[in-house]
Every structure is written in structure tokens, then in C-alpha cells.
């Protein structure tokens, strides 16, 4: 986002002046040739920008092309996220990359507009990530209410609010100059000479030395709260609760699998052997935890260092000879710029994290012309997707389990019949516990089998599609 405000120093001003004089005095009046470090920097930043563009364009194209993807309300938020990341790659990254390689800001008065774009696009990207986490939590914790309430209109209103807030904290303060530290900009300590103030030495031949801006403390803290700290707190809460819900559902459904496998083993072999379902359940829980850790870990690692520095810089003191050092120590411009690019790099990772579930991958394969190469063998994976967690497994073994359920679980009976034959049923149930009882209201008596098919036998099933279970381990009906 916004580069750091600096209490300018004479040393930095002299370096900028010397660099620009060297460029002006180059043979033929042209800029000096790029050094090895500049070439490497240009190559890396170009790759980052191109990857960000291609990844987010591919996400948008996949949703536009696929009717199935367009039908999901969640993908409205994915599109909004991809658009905000596209804007980062188009309106923010290229200009800063040129300035990094050139060593100065060559675009003059465009600086203020670029700063506004920077704040707007970065804030919109983060707010969209927050909305996705809230959307997934609602879908998983209250699925039936979510299906009724989460309409296209509601989704568009949520997206509009995110973009409106991003514009309000960017263009209005920047264009009205509310974001600058006026005292700092008027009273720079650094002088090019004993009489030349920093601002007058900031430009040479119409070329601005830098596009940095001194943020006032109020704007730095308030914008950081809105753009990062409040959204990240919401994301931590929602993903923690999602993990707990997923853990409960995985364990309940796994108990049905263990009961079926145990009974099948006892009847076929005449002896009961331990089954691997418990280990599989633990593996699934571990994968869910890893998935959520990746989502939060990537986001926090990319943005947290920048926003810590963004709040520290307005309070830092350069410790010049004119006064004692107070507040936080200032950070170097290079350090700050590195963390700025770390934050922007999050826009290149979002397409991988949020749009790489099986549904998206199929459309990606069609768009790229590699459908046969990408989907030859089913591999058990946990995908980070727009619906958060997806299991994609080979279903042969689970079809056998479902068939065992169909043959082994007794048909549903009325409450009167259950009281009469309670003792006989208890003997026939064998290893089945109370968690595997069939509810009297079950229409088919095969609800347990359906739950297994729902979890393991669909091509792509996510926690967003798993309905909450009743205390008897059956899905609620609307």
C-alpha cells in the first residue's frame, strides 16, 4: 500500500541529487544503463506482475465461461477478489516497479492518483478476503438459512460495501490531502544545503525524486485498522469456528463409517478387526487444519509486516543533530519497499488459494487445453477452494461401504414397534451404537448411507455442502 512517510535527511537528499545528476550526464543525455541488480529486480517484478495478471484473468474467465460456477453465490466474491487483485497488478505494481528499477519516481504529479489507487485496490482485496471468510462461515454454520438469505442481491450489496469503503478511505483523503503529515512536510529536517529545503531539492529537471508521502498518525492508524487489523481479526474468528464445525462433522460421519466397516468385518470374517477409519478421520482433520493454516498464514505473512511498519513510521524519529531521538527508530526505505511488495504478492497467491478447487481446475484445464492431462487419476487431496475445504477421493472403496450400509442397517420402524422389539434390535445391532440409529422420520431408512455418499462418493464435496448433523448424527431437513 502507501509507501512510508519519511522525515527527510540531508544524506538521502544528496544521494537522490547525485543519482539524478548521473542520469542526466549520461552519454547522449539518456539514462545510465541498468546494472545487474536492477536487471534482476526488473525480471523478478515483471514475473510477479505477469503471474498476478494471468492468474486473476484466468479466474474471471473461468467463472464467465462456466454456468456451474456462475450459479454459486460464493463466486461473486471470488470475482470481486480477482478484480481487486487485477487492479493491483494493473494500476499499482507496474508504476512502482518502474520507479524501483529507475531509482526515482518518473511519473510526476501522477503520484497522488497512484497512491489513491494503491490504498483502494489493496484495501478492496483484503476486504474481499474477509467477506469470503464470513460467507463460508455462514454457509457452514447455518446452511439452510444461508440458502434462503444469500441471494445474488445480498452478495452484490456486500461487494459494493467493500468497494465503497475502499474508495472512501483512499481517494477522498488523498485528493483532499488529509493523509499527509503537514507538520512533517513543512518542516523537513533534511537540507540539501544550508538554505535549500527538502521540497525544493526533491525535483530535478521535472523528475520527482520519490513518491513517498508523510502519513499523519491519525490517518495511518485509522486506515490500517479498516484495511487490515479489523478484517484479519474477523478472519481469525471465522476460520477458527469453521475448523471446529468441520472437526465435529468429520468425527460424526466417521463414526458411521467405522460402525459399517466394523459390522461388515464381523459378518464376513466372523471376527472383528480394527478398522482404519479413525486414522482416516484424524487425517482429514489434519488436512482441514493445514488448509485453514495456509489461508491465514499466507495472508498474515504477506500483509502483517507492512501494516506494522505503516503504523510505526509516523511515530519514528530520525535522530538528527537538531534534537534527541524519540519514538520508534525509522526503517530504511529498502526494508519498507520489500514489505510493500510482500503485501502486493498476496494478490498473486489468492487465485491459487481461493480458486483451485476441482470445479475451477476443470474449467482451467478446458481454457488451457489440457483436460486429459490434468485429470487422469483421482488423487486424495484437500483443496483450498471457494467453498473452503474439498475432498476428492477414489470412490470405489466408499461405494462398498455405502452398499454395506444399505444391506446392514434395518429399515425405519414406528415408535410403537421400536418399544416392542427394543431388546431384539439391541441384540441385532451388534457394534452399532446410539449414534447410528435411524430416525423414525427418515423417509428411506438409508440416511446413513446417504451421508457416506455425500461425504465420500461425490466427485467434489466441501464443508460448505455438508449440512449440520442432529445429535443422532443425521442431517437436518429444511
UniProtKB/Swiss-Prot annotation:
Residues 65-75, 135-153, 241-289, 358-478 are cytoplasmic. It is found in: Cell membrane. Residues 1-38, 103-111, 180-215, 318-335 are extracellular. Disulfide bonds join 111-211. Keywords: Cell membrane, Disulfide bond, G-protein coupled receptor, Glycoprotein, Lipoprotein, Membrane, Palmitate, Receptor, Transducer, Transmembrane, Transmembrane helix. It is a multi-pass membrane protein. Residues 416-446 are annotated as: Disordered. It holds the Pfam family 7tm_1. The keyword Transferase does not apply. The chain crosses the membrane at residues 39-64, 76-102, 112-134, 154-179, 216-240, 290-317, 336-357. One of its GO terms (biological process) is sensitization. GO terms for cellular component: brush border membrane; ciliary membrane; cilium; non-motile cilium; synapse. The keyword Disulfide bond applies. SUPFAM superfamilies: Family A G protein-coupled receptor-like. One of its GO terms (molecular function) is dopamine neurotransmitter receptor activity, coupled via Gs. A lipid is attached at residue 370 (S-palmitoyl cysteine). Glycans are attached at residue 7. Residues 420-430 have a biased composition (Acidic residues). PANTHER family: ADRENERGIC RECEPTOR-RELATED G-PROTEIN COUPLED RECEPTOR, D(1B) DOPAMINE RECEPTOR. Dopamine receptor whose activity is mediated by G proteins which activate adenylyl cyclase. Belongs to the G-protein coupled receptor 1 family. This is D(1B) dopamine receptor. The gene is Drd5.
